[in-house]
Amino acid sequence: MSLADFDQLMMRRALDLARLGTGYARPNPLVGCVITHEGRIIGEGWHRQYGGPHAEVNAVAAVTEQHLLPRSRAYVTLEPCSHFGKTPPCADLLIDKGVAEVVVCNLDPNPLVAGRGLQKLRDAGIQVETGVLEAAGRWLNRRFFTVQEKQRPYVVLKWAETADGYLAGPYFQTVPISGELARVAVHQWRTEEQAI
């Protein structure tokens, strides 16, 4: 397997991990991290809940053989943060642990980060690669990107009406209109969205 194929495989795993934060990490983005050493996963994590440790912190903590970190490669779905917020900067953690390479899916559009995390890594001598599965990462965090880039919420509109154009039953009685699949989809959206 080529390095490019391996990078995509590991980033897919990181994206899968990031999805586990759905409904818990908001309003923060969904972030996953996989750490490898010589082609083997040695640690992985995701941002489990708002205010809690970020994906990189959880992935580093999961590494049982910490001595391997200086020769490791970290795959992160979003640029490691570079500022103090509810948690310390993840870029600093990766630098302190001596991670050799960092592969990033998307740059963080948040003005507090916006390239500063990657610059910190590069200034520390860490090799950085960006844009691996970038479109998949943007789709996963479309809500976060919309808020950061457009300063507005991500909007989902669900519309259902009867065959004759009504939105409810007679006398505004609640009746199912769109069926079971739509009901399941709406409940999924309610888990993912920040407002209804």
Listing of model-derived features with the role each one plays in the protein:
Residues 1-22, 41, 66, 85-196:
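Zinc-dependent deaminase
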Residues 46, 53-54, 74-93:
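Local cysteine-cluster metal-coordination motifs and their immediate loop/turn environment
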Residues 48, 52, 79-80, 107-110, ...:
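Short beta->alpha junction loops/turns
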Residues 58, 62, 72, 155-161:
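Protease-associated
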Residues 32-36, 76-77, 105, 158-160:
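Short beta-strand segments
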Residues 2-70, 78:
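Glycine/alanine-rich phosphate-binding loops at beta-alpha junctions
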